[in-house]
């Protein structure tokens, strides 16, 4: 969608900052343990585990740390059993928000998620209220658009669904289960992406064209991401170029 890469840049900067504090590492390790526990410990046979390992590597988690988390998940420790719950709601300006959590205390989690919404003029919705606006898929991006022909040839041959060119970057779209295969094919061809992830991509966008509302949306998303039980926060917000310029000052 329009503005996708710009919002993604904000998220990735925050992810790198959080990784320094260790918060992202903690959340990713939790997800690796869960993925390994619920599926095959071999990432080549477990698309979910493969996707979260890619996420771990993108924030410079070591292979040793990743392997220990996988081993923990396959060890069957009941202390690692957690509920995976998604919450849905709206922020100011009709921005749809999908919050993925892993928790050992549902009451605590829903209370903290609801507080983040209401404190920032948002509302926690019911199950199904916004989930239909998002599609789970793999996204592999390249900042060098001159690679379009090479990327298209390799990616489509590997089963990618589409390649988008917005004039500034290339976005390879895959089925989430096929994400690892397409990424491997691109890497084997010497086409190393600038970012790659399995995400929940919005089918529509909510336009925010003033800084005040944009700051409220970002504050709400920051509050949600800072909740220990929250794994991922997805939204369909799209900031205008003018708003983006002011936010990045």
Curated annotation (Swiss-Prot):
GO terms for biological process: regulation of DNA-templated transcription. It comes from the Bacteria. Signal peptide: none annotated. Keywords: Cytoplasm, DNA-binding, Transcription, Transcription regulation. GO terms for cellular component: cytosol. Transmembrane segments: none annotated. It is found in: Cytoplasm. Pfam families: TACO1_YebC_N (PF20772), Transcrip_reg (PF01709). GO terms for molecular function: DNA binding. The keyword Transcription applies. Belongs to the TACO1 family. This is Probable transcriptional regulatory protein Psyc_0938. It comes from Psychrobacter arcticus (strain DSM 17307 / VKM B-2377 / 273-4). The lineage of its organism: Bacteria, Pseudomonadati, Pseudomonadota, Gammaproteobacteria, Moraxellales.
């Amino acid at each position: 969608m329009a503005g996708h890469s710009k919002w993604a840049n904000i998220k990735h900067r925050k992810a790198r900052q959080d990784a320094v504090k260790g918060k992202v590492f903690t959340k990713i390790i939790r997800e690796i343990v869960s993925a390994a526990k619920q599926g095959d410990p071999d990432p080549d046979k477990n698309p979910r585990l493969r996707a979260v390992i890619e996420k771990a590597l993108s924030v410079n988690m070591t292979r040793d740390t990743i392997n220990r988390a996988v081993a923990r998940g396959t060890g069957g420790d009941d202390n690692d059993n957690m509920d995976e719950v998604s919450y849905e709601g709206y922020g100011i300006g009709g921005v749809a928000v999908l919050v993925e959590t892993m928790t050992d205390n549902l009451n605590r989690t829903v209370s903290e998620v609801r507080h983040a919404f209401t404190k920032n003029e948002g509302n926690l919705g019911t199950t199904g209220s916004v989930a239909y606006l998002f599609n789970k898929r793999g996204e592999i991006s390249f900042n060098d658009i001159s690679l379009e022909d090479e990327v298209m040839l390799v990616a489509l041959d590997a089963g990618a669904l589409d390649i988008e060119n917005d004039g500034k970057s290339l976005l390879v779209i895959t089925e989430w289960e096929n994400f690892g295969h397409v990424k491997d094919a691109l890497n084997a061809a010497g086409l190393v992406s600038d970012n790659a992830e399995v995400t929940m991509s919005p089918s529509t966008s909510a336009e925010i064209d003033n800084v005040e509302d944009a700051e409220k949306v970002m504050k709400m998303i920051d509050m949600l991401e800072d909740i220990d039980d929250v794994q991922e926060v997805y939204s369909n917000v799209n900031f205008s170029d003018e708003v983006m310029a002011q936010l990045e000052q």
